[in-house]
Amino acid sequence: MASLISFSLLPKPKAVRSSISAPQTQTINTEKLEDKFGRKGIKFSESNNIPMVELKVRNGSSLKLSLSDAHVLSYKPKVYWKDEGFEEVLYTVDGDESRGGVGVVIVNGEEPKGGSSVISGCDWSVKDTDSDAIDALQIELSCTAGVLDITYIVSLYPVSMATALVVKNNGRKPVTLKPGIMSYLRFKKRSGAGIQGLKGCSYCPNPPLSSPFELLSPSEAMKAESSGWFGSEEGEKPGIWAVEDSVITLLEKKMSRIYGAPPAERLKAVYNTPPSKFETIDQGRGLFFRMIRIGFEEMYVGSPGSMWDKYGKQHYFVCTGPTSMLVPVDVASGETWRGAMVIEHDNL
């Protein structure tokens, strides 16, 4: 596979603002972007008045990204050898504001009960694009939120996609952040959804980070199962740690968990870190996708259970992604923090 993500040649810091807050949005001209950044495999356009960019590599695998909110709305890799062997990986819901997909979240870690993402409504701009013989495509977005300069890099390869988050603190004081990259994955059936690779890992029931693209709010994610047919998650209480004892964790029941080392363990010189990757299992389609975390200390896994049909769709969905929620990230003045997520497969 091509070089995963390049963190070099990042945008220079913008003017420092006095607090962590999101600026006003501006109009994005896709025609100008196409002239400046468009190239083979990278196409800028508008869809329903929403500025978009589509990445498509040589084997036909594609990705669609909403430019105004840095929201990945579609990832359709080639997973079968037949001519039309493409499958949508992401679960999205259209509307005034699209939900689901893949999105980045950054919450002010100094707020004890969480809060909204500091980049909600952020003024994103395209900084650069790059390609390698259309077998590796990349687009770089950036925005400023208070004292933070934020760079978001989305990359596409023949059998994988990657999103990378780079946060620079231009303020005079340290900042505490709870970052995450959340993916809403599509499954054909509720009964055929699962993950493998987390056996032996500690986990704790916990609500997800709140975001504009969430399908279930943090309170909905923690709500007990409404139907008795598939059991109840009432036994899982926030703050109570357990160890995953299953080779395959079934996701038909409702759950909202953080997989990672307990905060107290992380104070020790040596402790067990969670696996850097695990696989999703979609038995209905016979597909497997590998979720990889880089730079983050935790993995979130949430399944809707009986609330799966909230949006009236035929497919089941699961929310997962790398995060640093239980132990926030401290970024000193002038310092930079980096994290990334990769979705890859070997279904071919």
Curated annotation (Swiss-Prot):
Residues 1-17 form a transit peptide. Keywords: Chloroplast, Membrane, Plastid, Thylakoid, Transit peptide, Transport. GO terms for biological process: carbohydrate metabolic process; photosynthetic electron transport in photosystem I. InterPro entries: Gal_mutarotase_sf_dom (IPR011013), GH-type_carb-bd (IPR014718). It is found in: Plastid, Chloroplast thylakoid membrane. Disruption phenotype: Malfunction of the NDH complex. H(2)O(2) accumulation in Dark-Light transition. Part of the chloroplast NDH complex, composed of a mixture of chloroplast and nucleus encoded subunits. Component of the NDH subcomplex B, at least composed of PnsB1, PnsB2, PnsB3, PnsB4 and PnsB5. NDH shuttles electrons from NAD(P)H:plastoquinone, via FMN and iron-sulfur (Fe-S) centers, to quinones in the photosynthetic chain and possibly in a chloroplast respiratory chain. The immediate electron acceptor for the enzyme in this species is believed to be plastoquinone. Couples the redox reaction to proton translocation, and thus conserves the redox energy in a proton gradient. This is Photosynthetic NDH subunit of subcomplex B 2, chloroplastic. The gene is PNSB2.
